């Protein structure tokens, strides 16, 4: 059985003081989460503050991006070595905002996945289609191509250490959400693709998260789907009460 992962992507929000307040609120209401994993991904500037707060708690620490080199003359970049030094165990790679705003392509994203793995970080590889691509009937083709491009040449053992997040671009921050059935169908397609790349045993063990306007009022229906193994949460992770409701989704799969 795959252990659900509920991940909060804070994007470019929260000063260090605001981050402290949010984490304290999360810890106050967290309770028993032994049957699921909880992750927060603050901006780089808040990682140190959040690390000190979540050490020894069930909340894991992740980053929102990483560069492909361990060190060097790469002004403004953050290396996987630095993230590990700060206590990160996860890193988001290939988020649609990185693809669209910063021009990141599949080749660079694949290198970031490898860099994360090489330094014992679990990459959360984000894939997803735009609204025009979905309307044109190309959603599955686009998503499968993104998965294959990012994981090209990797061994089954490497692929087994990756988390996938399906985030339909048209649903991110818009209030629109893929229906649970549509999300489930895409997750099945992704899992089938992983099976072709790494074998069914590996594919069956990989967490595939849904991301795209995940909210307290839709998390239960999403998590009831057999191939949705958690959520990558944006706006709803910025307030303790809403993220806690998502973390405490019901019912647990079993």
Swiss-Prot record:
Its EC number is 5.3.1.1. InterPro entries: Aldolase_TIM, TIM_sf, TrioseP_Isoase_bac/euk, Triosephosphate_isomerase, Triosephosphate_isomerase_AS. It is an enzyme of class 5 (isomerase). Keywords: Cytoplasm, Gluconeogenesis, Glycolysis, Isomerase. Homodimer. This is Triosephosphate isomerase. It comes from the Bacteria. The keyword Nucleotide-binding does not apply. PANTHER family: TRIOSEPHOSPHATE ISOMERASE (PTHR21139:SF42). Pfam families: TIM. GO terms for molecular function: triose-phosphate isomerase activity. The keyword Cytoplasm applies. Pathway: Carbohydrate biosynthesis; gluconeogenesis; Carbohydrate degradation; glycolysis; D-glyceraldehyde 3-phosphate from glycerone phosphate: step 1/1. Belongs to the triosephosphate isomerase family. GO terms for cellular component: cytosol. It catalyses: D-glyceraldehyde 3-phosphate = dihydroxyacetone phosphate. CDD domains: TIM (cd00311). The gene is tpiA. Substrate binds at residues 9-11, 173, 213, 234-235. GO terms for biological process: gluconeogenesis; glyceraldehyde-3-phosphate biosynthetic process; glycerol catabolic process; glycolytic process. It comes from Roseiflexus sp. (strain RS-1).
């Amino acid at each position: 059985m795959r252990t659900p992962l509920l991940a909060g992507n804070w994007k470019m929000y929260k000063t260090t003081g605001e981050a402290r307040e949010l984490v304290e609120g999360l810890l106050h209401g967290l309770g028993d989460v032994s049957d699921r994993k909880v992750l927060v991904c603050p901006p780089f500037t808040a990682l140190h503050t959040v690390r000190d707060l979540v050490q020894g708690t069930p909340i894991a620490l992740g980053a929102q991006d990483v560069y492909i080199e361990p060190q060097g003359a790469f002004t403004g970049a953050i290396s996987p070595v630095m993230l590990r030094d700060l206590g990160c165990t996860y890193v988001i790679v290939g988020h649609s905002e990185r693809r669209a705003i910063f021009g990141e392509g599949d080749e660079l994203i694949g290198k970031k996945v490898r860099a994360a793995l090489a330094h014992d970080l679990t990459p959360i590889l984000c894939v997803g289609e735009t609204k025009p691509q979905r309307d044109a009937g190309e959603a599955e083709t686009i998503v499968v191509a993104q998965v294959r491009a990012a994981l090209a040449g990797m061994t089954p053992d490497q692929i087994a250490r990756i988390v996938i997040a399906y985030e339909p671009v048209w649903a991110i921050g818009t209030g629109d959400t893929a229906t649970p059935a549509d999300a489930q169908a895409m997750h099945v397609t992704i899992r089938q693709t992983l099976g072709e790349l790494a074998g069914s045993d590996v594919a069956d063990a990989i967490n595939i998260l849904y991301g795209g306007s995940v909210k307290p009022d839709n998390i239960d229906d999403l998590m009831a789907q057999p191939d949705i193994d958690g959520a990558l949460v944006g706006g709803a992770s910025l307030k303790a009460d809403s993220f806690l409701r998502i973390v405490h989704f019901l019912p647990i799969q079993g």
